[in-house]
Each structure stands twice: as C-alpha cells, then as structure tokens.
Amino acid sequence: AREFQADASVSLTAEGRIIAMEAAFRNAIGAYSIFPRSSVGDSVHAATQLGAPYQMKRLKTSASTFWQNKTPSGAIRGVGQPVPCTVTEQLMDRAARYLGEDPAAFRRRHYLQGASFPLTTHGGVYMDRLSLTECLDLLLDKMHYKELRKEQLALRKKGILRGIGIATFIEQTAVGPGLYGAAGVPATSIEETRIRLEADGSIRVETGATDQGQGTLTGIRQITAGILGCETEAVEVAASNSSGARGGGAWASRGLSLAGEATALAAEALRDNILYVASLLLQAEPA
C-alpha cells in the first residue's frame, strides 16, 4: 500500500487566477527497492504530475523517499499518479471555497485549453491532446449537477450534509521506451507484431502482447482483418511465445495501445505487399 505525506499550497492572484502550486512529497517504500522498475516511481509521478490538468505560471515540487523496516512497496495501480491527483484536487477545492466559487466552474476556467496542445507541462509531462472542458461538461450533464446542488442546499437546511466531489485525473498510460529508456529502467517496453499470409490464404499474426482477459488478442485480430479486408475468422493470433515476436507485457494500459499500433503498421505493410504482387500478376496499378 502507498504511504505518502504531502505539504502543498496554491497561490492565487487578486482576480482569482492560479499562478503557482507547490508541494513536498514524502514516500515511504519499505526495506528495499523492487527491481526492475524500482520503488521511486510513485515519488517521480507525484512530483511531475502535480497540477497537470490546469493552467499556471509556476510549479515547484520535491519528492523524498524513505526506507522502512517493513514490506517494500512497488509499482501498483497507477504508480503514484493518484497521489498528485488527490493533492491537486484538494487544492482546487480549497481555492474555490476561498473565492466563494463553484468548484466545477473554477476547474473549467483553469483547464488547459485545446488550442494550447500539444504542450509540455511544468512537470515535464508531454501531452498531445486532451478535451478536459468537454469531458467536464459531459460529466456535469450526465450527473445533473445543477439539480444535485439544489438538492444539497435543501438537505442542508434540514441538517443533512451531502458532499459532491469532482476530480480531474490525467493518467500516463501506454508507456514504452520513451519513458523507460530515458529513465534508464532495464525493462522491456517495446511491442512487435509479425504478420504472414499463409499458402491457404489465411493470416497468421505473431504478437508479443499478452492477454489476461482484457480482450487484447481479439482487438489485434480485428485490427488485422480490418486493414487487410478479410474476415476475422481468417486471422489466427499467436501470443506469448518467447521465440516469436517480442513484447513488454500487459501493464499500464499499454497492451492494445502499443501492440495494436504495431499490428496496424505490420498489416499495412503486408497489404501493400499483397497489392504490389497482385499488380505484377495482373499487370495493373495497385489499387
């Protein structure tokens, strides 16, 4: 289990705009660091992802890791990312309360906007594209936010306290060599797919991805069939063969994101080869 402490603050302008966030994280990890990803990943994510969804001019964070005479903790469930989310969202709630502003509206006007993307946050996290405002508006509509607020006030007059919480969580997933290579972590994080057209017209796919019930292999079969224009029943997928295609495993929501992309690239290459050979046989231009 995680064992974090954080001292955090948010700075506002006289007009109620966030200009900075600051936090010092302390993370106890147990008796030793877990190989190969180590036990400091939680601390790194906490320090780099504080305030990630929001506009601000400055960010200051630090993270300290402590040894303990107890069972070590490692990379579990989001690897530290729930920690900066929890701290950030508490700061947002307190700032909104201080200003007397609705917490949802306060978040909306501080969100990173579509025109700002792609961007690198103050914590060094690259973001290609996010639709934060659209997601919030959809959420508020689905949960009937205005009606809930009215009901909340009515219940409060009767002495019944009901809380309404909103949080914006950005999770870094589908990680590969760009993260692990740069961090020097000795963990395989590539994904490889090999696709072959068999003599009987069937398609054989070798993937390094693993599937423990997520449906990854079904997705790979569908991607292959869609690009090659064949029935899914004609596609055979072979996985988890150490002498076959290489892969990094199923973690960090990366299975279909990376293996699926590798499959798409391989299927497109095979399709181009099929069309080229067919054009030679038929003496026609590839379609």
Give the predicted meaning of each segment.
Residues A1, I19-A24, P103-L112, K150-I166, ...:
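Beta-strand segments within the central parallel beta-sheet cores of soluble alpha/beta enzyme folds
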Residues S38-Q49, A75-H110, E134, L138, ...:
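Alpha-helical support elements that line or immediately flank enzyme active sites
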Residues Y111-S202:
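Helix-loop-helix junctions that connect adjacent transmembrane helices in secondary transporters/permeases
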Residues A28-Y32, Q113-P118, Q172-P177, I203, ...:
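Flexible loop/turn segments at secondary-structure boundaries
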Residues W67-P72, Y111-T120, D200-I203, G244-L256:
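Short acidic (Asp/Glu) and glycine-rich catalytic loops that position anionic groups and cofactors
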Residues N27, L59-S64, R109, V185-I190, ...:
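Flexible glycine/proline-rich, aromatic-decorated loop/lid segments
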Residues A1-A31, L138, Y145-E147, G260-A287:
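Phosphate/diphosphate-binding loops
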Residues E3-Q90, I170, G181-E191:
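Glycine-rich loop/linker segments at domain edges
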